[in-house]
Amino acid sequence: MANIVYKLSESEIQHLLQQITFETSQLSPGMKARTKYKQSVINIYNSGKVMFQGKNAEAVAQQLLPDHTTTSKNSSSSNQSSGETLAYNHYNCIGSDEAGSGDYFGPLTVCAAYVSKENVKILKTLGVDDSKKLNDQKIIELAEQLITFIPHSLLTLDNPKYNDRQAIGWSQVKMKAELHNEAIKNVTQKINCNELNYIVIDQFAVRGVYQRYALSSLPYPEKTKFETKGESKSLAIAAASIISRYAFVKHMDHISHKMKQDIPKGASNKVDLIAAQIIDKHGIETLDLISKKHFKNREKAQNLVTKKYK
């Protein structure tokens, strides 16, 4: 299926909206309008980008936007990976990654995403990259576009469930293995697996440990690869990373709104201070509902509160 992307001005978008009928209600986050026209799907995003999808995408784009040239050109050899790493972007891949594992506050989110080799160009055009290089605003903008057309599964382990599992002896590695495997299985049920070439997991454990902790077998073990710094090697992992980070950021925004104060990410001294403030205002039980209890930040925050009242 062809995918073509244009970046339009607001006046150009308004002109496009007047040419044919678009649906503007009950849309995915980040989407301004959507329609089906001549066996093609047209998505208009709040970012100003317009995506044409379908076998007639190019012809429809030329009809509706005759003065524009597509921005989704073939990239050069940037698809190639060095060393022994496979050039995953030449293949149809499921990638998986997580967010929140190093953050005291907030949940653990895991996403698996399927990127066909035909969609590699479109992801590059949109600016998909390692989520660690992107700020929250860009993460939200990209994720709200990706979730409209990339088959994916997003799982969130909230803090109460995370803490319950940790209390009965689950390590974070075990939690991640179980969630990654579940998300990957969910995606395999959404695609034609005869066309799937590889499953690429951003490595947090060696294969043997992952298989032992995953609670169920790998869907396609012969196709499964583990890669360190996977976001830079596979756009499927990069897409999964962005969507999982998006879910984490939105959840953190929800916590901040609920607590009526900014809740920082990470596990720094600033986090200790905010945690101490929450204990002081609301009690340790409230803190435990929005944080990972086994992090050392909890003890440090309690010590700060104790010192305050000495």
UniProtKB/Swiss-Prot annotation:
Protein localization: Cytoplasm
BP GO annotations: DNA replication, removal of RNA primer; mismatch repair
One Pfam family hit: DUF3378
E.C. code: 3.1.26.4
Cofactor note: Manganese or magnesium. Binds 1 divalent metal ion per monomer in the absence of substrate. May bind a second metal ion after substrate binding.
Molecular functions (GO terms): magnesium ion binding; RNA binding; RNA-DNA hybrid ribonuclease activity
Domain called RNase H type-2: residue spans: 91-307
UniProt enzyme class: hydrolase
Catalyzed reactions per annotation: Endonucleolytic cleavage to 5'-phosphomonoester
Binding residues for a divalent metal cation: D97, E98, D202
Disulfide bonds: none
A single Gene Ontology CC term: cytoplasm
Coiled coil: none
CDD domains according to UniProt: RNase_HII_bacteria_HIII_like, RNAse_HIII_N
Protein keywords: Cytoplasm, Endonuclease, Hydrolase, Magnesium, Metal-binding, Nuclease
Origin superkingdom: Bacteria
Cofactor: Mn(2+); Mg(2+)
KW Disulfide bond (keyword) present: no
PANTHER family linked to this entry: RIBONUCLEASE (PTHR10954:SF23), RIBONUCLEASE H2 SUBUNIT A (PTHR10954)
Function (record text): Endonuclease that specifically degrades the RNA of RNA-DNA hybrids.
Family: Belongs to the RNase HII family. RnhC subfamily.
Official protein name in the record: Ribonuclease HIII
Gene: rnhC
